[in-house]
A protein has these predicted regions:
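N-terminal transmembrane-helix/juxtamembrane module of multi-pass inner/ER membrane proteins
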Residues: 1-75, 133
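Membrane-interface loops
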Residues: 33-49, 53, 84-176
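Alpha-helical transmembrane segments of integral membrane proteins
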Residues: 10, 14-22, 91-99, 176-183, ...
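Interfacial helix-loop-helix junctions of multi-pass membrane proteins
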Residues: 122, 144, 148-152, 187-214
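Hydrophobic transmembrane alpha-helices
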Residues: 164-168, 210-218
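Aromatic-anchored segments of alpha-helical transmembrane domains
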Residues: 26-31, 101-110, 183-193
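Membrane-interface loop-to-helix entry segments
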Residues: 59-73, 145-166, 200, 204
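Hydrophobic, membrane-inserted alpha-helices
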Residues: 52, 74-78, 158-166, 183-191
């Protein structure tokens, strides 16, 4: 535990600033994508990227909303951890992450997607009493209410994958933290479909985009 707090204290200020900035940047792009899709009329093209024989088989598991909401903390800590790997790698990480965000944003504007939560009957679970029900309502109501847009690629999957890829091969990062980052990325991806915030294809897109961007910026 002592080593953990020493590591936290050793994070450069710019690491924490970057974590908060990217969190705000994500939310800003999400809102801007929605707005531009409305203004340009591309929202009329919106479709549900549902693959029934896959998505209808995925069960609803409410407690996964914990991982879904915890992701915001994970996303702040991700850039902070990468800042411990040196400025050169940190710059590459920021470029790759920014490119991933912007690529996702292009999809939001020109290939808008949606989920009808009424049709999917998810509010049945959100209206149950208790902490899990409250967390589900919080997640849904802050993401469009009855209709959620900007599904593909899943930003939850995209950003979590970025945080993992940033530390995956770095010798400065402990094996334990790498395992933690990988496990959290998997759990967050699972949460998006288990609480019916996304469809399966959104996960594929959310993982493919950062894989491409990191391959480009880390090719040397």
């Amino acid at each position: 535990m002592k080593k953990f707090f020493q590591k936290v204290r050793s994070v450069p200020l710019y690491g924490w600033v970057a974590g908060v900035f990217f969190l705000a940047f994500e939310y800003g792009l999400y809102l801007l994508g929605n707005w531009l899709a409305h203004v340009t009329g591309t929202l009329s093209w919106a479709f549900a990227p549902k693959v029934p024989f896959i998505d209808d088989k995925i069960p609803f598991i409410g407690f996964f909303v914990i991982f879904y909401i915890y992701s915001y903390i994970f996303w702040i800590c991700g850039p902070a951890a990468v800042s411990l790997t040196g400025k050169d790698n940190f710059k590459k990480f920021c470029k790759a992450m920014t490119a991933s965000y912007l690529m996702g944003f292009v999809f939001f504007v020109f290939m808008p997607t949606y989920i009808d939560r009424v049709a999917e009957n998810v509010y049945f679970y959100a209206n149950r009493p208790g902490v899990i029900g409250w967390m589900l309502r919080f997640a849904y109501d802050n993401d469009g209410g009855n209709i959620g847009y900007n599904l593909f690629p899943s930003y939850h999957c995209l950003i979590s994958a970025c945080c993992y890829l940033g530390v995956r091969k770095r010798p400065e990062i402990s094996k334990a933290f790498k395992v933690y980052s990988f496990v959290m990325t998997v759990l967050i991806c699972m949460s998006t479909v288990f609480i019916k915030q996304h469809y399966f294809l959104d996960i594929i897109g959310g993982l493919a985009v950062p894989a491409i961007c990191f391959a480009i910026f880390y090719k040397n």
